[in-house]
Amino acid sequence: MAQLIDGKVISTKIKDEVKEKVAGLKEQGCEVTLAVIQVGADPASSVYVRNKKKACEYVGIRSLAYELPEETTEEKLLELIRELNDRTDVNGILVQLPLPKHIDEEKVLDSISPLKDVDGFHPRNVGALCIGKPGFVSCTPAGVIQLLKRSGIEIAGKECVVVGRSNIVGKPMALLLLRENGTVTVAHSRTKDLKEVTKRADILVVA
């Protein structure tokens, strides 16, 4: 039987929990700081960046916004990331995707310190996820796990089907479900009879 999950209620609860933890860190003299870099003025990216800024304000995280022009060179962007990697007052670095075509996205993401890679895209964090070690995890898949757990949905032993195999959502989603002892199938553009594959799912994630 299908269950309707109210994501907004769960999201608010999580943000309130984070707010409490951030306040505790401030009492210990640590001001949590997130640096967000956007190259160009893609409308969708601008909306995402504004939402991240609002979320930071709500939970008490200091956010630093770096809005770079479309023509910013790859080297200039890498130079900024190196500076942020070295700053002791910056805890997390997030580069808003997509980047302009003249910039190597993979090279940029790999240049972020794994200790500040809050999006979980660095190969070291991806590798940690694969072998079940601690590390940053891609936000959307991590959010799905939180939605399931906080809704009282048992993952262990369930037939879990993930539709999509992207590095950002599909693959980490499958790995997180495996970590929770789900029986995972990944479907994609070459999957035969997608309808039959999805019909057998107890948990279906379209990624």
Residue ranges and their predicted role:
Residues 56-71, 184-186:
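Short beta-strand elements in bilobed, periplasmic/extracellular small-molecule ligand-binding domains
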